[in-house]
């Protein structure tokens, strides 16, 4: 059934816009240039407002997810990377459940990627329609059908641009992937802004700066009681404080420390005697993929819950899925879940919230750990990184594990890879929960993504440098 399904969508994949693979080896400096151009286009789209919207000042239901999904309210990047990640999530679950069978052949892999892109475009249209019809940009009946259609077209074109930018980097023209680049940029921008933002906010304590570091110096300069000023800068509520900043730096350090954990399996050449090497299996074997897929799952649940609560407010089943409330204090207007499934799957706002509602905290911990371990375990099967795939790669390179025959390599790799994937996903979920409970800026998930992505770019840079020999040769 799986192969038939991929064959059915083959004609549709043929008409999709596609980036051709490079016909020659792309130099590192060219990759840097293409990566910079891709990032520039993304940042420009983040600043171009959608034409025709009446208002985007209402409470934002996706405020907590925007950092992770690289989206910006009221702009062309309203949907961010959500459609790409959601399509990846759906295809992964279908392949993991064996509803779709993906073979080891390049043809099947290409069809699978094409199907993912096709679903991404369909989801872009679906999400755009939901955003417009639920009144995120004003009452649809007041805007008129023409304006509603225009907004949907803008969001679709922007979604297509994101798909192609991601594919451009994935095909080898740039460094890493578009998804990783956009997420890391958005998260780092948020952390820097929350630390140094000069924006003033009127609170019950008077006018304060949003940025934690600027607020620290402002409070010390304007308050006569310096001890109280320090206490306020470290512990103030509803705005970024110094403790949040310290927690962020601490989580950064912990994640970087865990990145170094790995098991090196000894391998040797089957052709040349005396040629030995190691095959590293990292603790974070699937990197940040589990947390990205988990974020996509939650964000789509939020979309469905918001849409239903807007249309069927008061319905028992809708309330069971999620009840929402608006918050306007200490920053932009935002909607947050206060009851239902969405509430229990959202992180507690602070350690105090954990103590106030331990059941919420417990359910959130179980969900994060379980979903990350599950996504990590299933991802290796569809991404070509399972024990069988690794054994095949080693065989093609004429490498074997020391002390094992070719036939027993899969069995030996199976002792390590699925365990590393599941335990690594569990650790990623645990670190994300810890960061959320500590109140780190940008959310635990966001920081985890930023660190793992930056570390990936560091590894790419080191690899390219070792191949080129020097920094000068690398860039010039």
UniProtKB/Swiss-Prot annotation:
Family annotation (InterPro entries): SecY/SEC61-alpha, SecY_CS, SecY_dom_sf, Translocon_Sec61/SecY_plug_dom
A Pfam family hit? SecY
Q: Give TM segment ranges.
A: 34-53, 77-96, 118-138, 145-165, 173-193, 241-261, 289-309, 355-375, 421-441, 446-462
Q: Give the matching Gene3D superfamilies.
A: SecY subunit domain (1.10.3370.10)
Q: Which UniProt keywords apply?
A: Developmental protein, Endoplasmic reticulum, Membrane, Protein transport, Translocation, Transmembrane, Transmembrane helix, Transport
Intervals, Cytoplasmic compartment: 2-33, 97-117, 166-172, 262-288, 376-420, 463-476
Q: How does it sit in the membrane?
A: Multi-pass membrane protein
Q: Which residues lie on this side of the membrane: Lumenal?
A: 54-76, 139-144, 194-240, 310-354, 442-445
Report the locations given in the UniProt record: Endoplasmic reticulum membrane
Gene Ontology BP, a term: protein targeting to ER
Q: Which GO terms describe its cellular component?
A: endoplasmic reticulum membrane
Please describe the quaternary structure of this protein: The SEC61 channel-forming translocon complex consists of channel-forming core components SEC61A1, SEC61B and SEC61G and different auxiliary components such as SEC62 and SEC63. The SEC61 channel associates with the multi-pass translocon (MPT) complex.
Q: Which family does the similarity line name?
A: Belongs to the SecY/SEC61-alpha family.
The free-text function statement in the UniProt record for this protein reads:
Component of SEC61 channel-forming translocon complex that mediates transport of signal peptide-containing precursor polypeptides across the endoplasmic reticulum (ER). Forms a ribosome receptor and a gated pore in the ER membrane, both functions required for cotranslational translocation of nascent polypeptides. May cooperate with auxiliary protein SEC62, SEC63 and HSPA5/BiP to enable post-translational transport of small presecretory proteins.
Q: What is this protein called?
A: Protein transport protein Sec61 subunit alpha
Could you read off the lineage of the organism from its UniProt record? Answer: Eukaryota, Metazoa, Chordata, Craniata, Vertebrata
Q: Which gene encodes it?
A: sec61a
């Amino acid at each position: 059934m799986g192969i038939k399904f991929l064959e059915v969508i083959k004609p549709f994949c043929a008409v999709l816009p596609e980036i051709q693979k490079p016909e020659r080896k792309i130099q590192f400096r060219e990759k840097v240039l293409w990566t910079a151009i891709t990032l520039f286009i993304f940042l420009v789209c983040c600043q171009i407002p959608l034409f025709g919207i009446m208002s985007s000042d209402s409470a934002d239901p996706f405020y907590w997810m925007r950092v992770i999904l690289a989206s910006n309210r009221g702009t062309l990047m309203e949907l961010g990377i959500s459609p790409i990640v959601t399509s990846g999530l759906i295809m992964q679950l279908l392949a993991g459940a064996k509803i779709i069978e993906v073979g080891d052949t390049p043809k099947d892999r290409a069809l699978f990627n094409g199907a993912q892109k096709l679903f991404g475009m369909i989801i872009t249209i679906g999400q755009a329609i939901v955003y417009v019809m639920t009144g995120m940009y004003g009452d649809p009946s007041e805007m008129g059908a023409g304006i509603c259609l225009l907004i949907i077209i803008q969001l679709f074109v922007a979604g297509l641009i994101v798909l192609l930018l991601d594919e451009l980097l994935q095909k080898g023209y740039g460094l890493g992937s578009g998804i990783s680049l956009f997420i890391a940029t958005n998260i780092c921008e948020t952390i820097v802004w929350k630390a140094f933002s000069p924006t003033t906010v009127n609170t019950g304590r008077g006018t304060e700066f949003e940025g934690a570091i600027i607020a620290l110096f402002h409070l010390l300069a304007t308050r006569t009681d310096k001890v109280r000023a320090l206490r306020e800068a470290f512990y103030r509520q509803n705005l970024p404080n110094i403790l949040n900043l310290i927690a962020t730096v601490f989580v950064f350090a912990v994640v970087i420390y865990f990145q170094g954990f790995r098991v090196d399996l000894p391998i040797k050449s089957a052709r040349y005697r005396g040629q030995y090497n190691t095959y590293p299996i990292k603790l974070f074997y699937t990197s940040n993929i589990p947390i990205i897929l988990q974020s996509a799952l939650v964000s789509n649940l939020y979309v469905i819950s918001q849409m239903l609560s807007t249309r069927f407010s008061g319905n028992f089943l809708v309330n069971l899925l999620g009840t929402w409330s608006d918050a306007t204090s200490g920053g932009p207007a935002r909607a947050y879940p206060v009851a239902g499934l969405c509430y229990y799957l959202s992180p507690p706002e602070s350690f105090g919230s954990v103590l106030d509602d331990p059941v919420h905290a417990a359910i959130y911990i179980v969900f994060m750990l379980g979903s990350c371990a599950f996504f990590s375990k299933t991802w290796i099967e569809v991404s070509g990184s399972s024990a069988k795939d690794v054994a095949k790669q080693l065989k093609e390179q004429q490498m074997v594990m020391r002390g094992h025959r070719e036939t027993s390599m899969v069995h030996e790799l199976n002792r390590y890879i699925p365990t590393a994937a599941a335990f690594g996903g569990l650790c990623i979920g645990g670190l994300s929960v810890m960061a959320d409970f500590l109140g780190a800026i940008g959310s635990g998930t966001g920081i985890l993504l930023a660190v793992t992505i930056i570390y990936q770019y560091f590894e790419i840079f080191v690899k390219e440098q070792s191949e080129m020999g020097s920094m000068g040769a690398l860039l010039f």
